């Protein structure tokens, strides 16, 4: 039996493009993955449309040198849920190591229309 495909193989193009752009610190490529009227909710703060998303990405993604390491992927209808370990230059005091967050991507017509980012609590 062959080895299973890596989680990246399961990703729709806009999700794969977003993660690649984050890891490459490529702001233009990151913003290009979003539809014009998209929304990002990052830890309960909302950013709408390309200008809002661009400002958020510059500050929170590029400015913090964020790096995403995928741990798991679940597809649910038009949504892709990615559990990932995050690293970067952000203040890590009080955060678990590794920092695990869940990205909830909604896509339409080859663009991200909604992204919700949460640090979920363990059920243990």
Which residue ranges define each predicted feature?
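Short beta-edge strand/loop motif at the mouth of beta-sheet-based domains
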Residues: 47-56
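A beta-strand edge to alpha-helix "cap/lid" segment located at domain peripheries
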Residues: 2-5, 55-124
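Short, low-complexity N-terminal intrinsically disordered segments enriched in polar/charged residues
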Residues: 1-28, 32, 124
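Alpha-helix boundary/capping residues
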Residues: 22, 34-37, 60, 119
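A short gly/proline-enriched turn/hairpin at secondary-structure junctions
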Residues: 37-48
């Amino acid at each position: 039996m062959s080895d299973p495909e890596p989680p990246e193989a399961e990703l729709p193009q806009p999700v794969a493009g977003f993660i690649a752009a984050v890891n490459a610190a490529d702001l233009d490529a990151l913003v290009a993955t979003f539809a014009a009227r998209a929304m990002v909710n990052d830890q309960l703060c909302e950013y709408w449309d390309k200008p809002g998303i661009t400002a958020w990405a510059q500050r929170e993604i590029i400015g913090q040198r964020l790096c995403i390491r995928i741990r798991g992927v679940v597809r649910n209808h038009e949504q892709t849920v990615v559990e990932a370990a995050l690293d970067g230059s952000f203040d890590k005091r009080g955060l678990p190591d590794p920092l695990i967050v869940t990205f909830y991507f909604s896509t339409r017509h080859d663009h991200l229309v909604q992204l919700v980012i949460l640090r979920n609590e363990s059920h243990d």
